[in-house]
Amino acid sequence: MFTGIVVFLIYAVVAHLFSYYFKKNRVLHSQKWGLNICCGKTDGGGVNADIVQHKELPNFRLVEDIYNLPFANKTFDCVLCSHTLEHVDDPKSFFSELERVGEKVTLVLPPLYDLFAAFNIFEHKVIFLTFKKEHHSLPLYITLPFARTLHDKWGQLNRA
């Protein structure tokens, strides 16, 4: 029993590190992004935009409403949205807005094999039903059980 728990925890940690650090960074550094939306502390090489400025980044734009971005239609050839859709109230509307401002949208999402990220009810509102990290369309998703109740009562750990 104890050995099984240890093996599970080792798997979960290794899968999370592989998914979040290796695979995410591989996508981020694969090209220069016209728009890196909800950029956090990462520089995508073009316009970096977020609802909060986490650190000094080149070409940073503060965005007030992710569902109504301050850019004209098809302003950007390529848009990167990494580890954000799982935090928002309405992933479909946000994805539609990304498609409006970008020719090609790339989503980086927590895959199901990354158990720590995929089932994180303290930060995430939805779980994407995918084993892939990178997407160009919105995959199927479901609302995480108890996440909204938890966020309403005690707040969301990381707000998007």
What feature does the model see in each segment?
Residues K92-A160:
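S-adenosyl-L-methionine-dependent methyltransferase catalytic module, highlighting the catalytic core
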Residues M1-R26:
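N-terminal membrane-anchoring alpha-helices
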Residues T3, A72, D77, L129-K132:
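Compositionally biased, low-structure terminal segments
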Residues Y11, Y20-Y21, Y67, Y113, ...:
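Sequence-level detector for tyrosine residue identity
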Residues K32-D114:
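Conserved SAM-binding loop
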